[in-house]
């Protein structure tokens, strides 16, 4: 058995914590209580990646875990961390920030049990629902609002280029960092460009992509670019300038068939305005006016 495990890719405790998006202390608790596949070699805990992924799938099938795929969001990360602290290791929620469109795809292919998204439909001006109608037409689902958040331009402190909006950014050839294809932020940028009748080739750095809002902010902070598109909180965290462009709706989508399972009901119960207000206390740029509201049932 040990020889077979050695032939697999083995993860360290830190690598496993990053994969599961957990604190390293939680990994040791999983070893003790959760039965996660592991082996100890020369005094170090190692984890066979294939067996770990299969262990996750089995727990999902037993309705002990759920996987949420979709958009990157800092407040959602806080909510999931808070949930896990209270219920770990009885149930764990895994979070894969692959982008809004990829999240819908994961849900439609039954690779995830929920998805989170912020997709602006350019024809209707509506968030999320038109995309769900197109991509989940054969499934029944429930849409819950998590929160609204401000999206805009993240700029160097004191805005040395004097950028006031997208027009200035393009005309002054400011160095830009983009988000990954399929993310709601990327689609929002493409919508803005179409409204202004700019072409993507006019943006310096349009093909320079990162996966998260924080990465956008860090690229600006380190002087690698002049501007990026992201949420207000990142600019606050890194003491950067921010020009708001849009308040967007950030929703959670759950298949109807999974609504009754214990871990899903517990998680939905945690989407309580009072609880979210506590978690969002130090996060500017968020509005909880519709938090927890069921927006749609198919």
Specify the residue positions occupied by each region the protein language model found.
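Short helix-loop capping/hinge motifs at secondary-structure junctions, enriched
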Residues: 157-164, 198-199, 257-263
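Flexible hinge/capping segments at coil-to-helix
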Residues: 146, 155-176
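Short beta-strand-centered segments that line the small-molecule binding cleft or hinge
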Residues: 103-150, 220
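Short loop->beta-strand "edge-of-pocket" segments that line small-molecule binding or catalytic clefts
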Residues: 64-72, 167-187
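A ligand-binding cleft/hinge motif common to bilobed small-molecule-binding domains
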Residues: 118-132, 217-246
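N-terminal hydrophobic or amphipathic helices and topogenic motifs
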Residues: 1-102, 111, 135-141, 166, ...
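Short beta-strand-to-loop elements that line the ligand-binding cleft
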Residues: 92-99, 200-213
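Periplasmic-binding protein-like
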Residues: 9, 143-150, 236-269, 290-291, ...
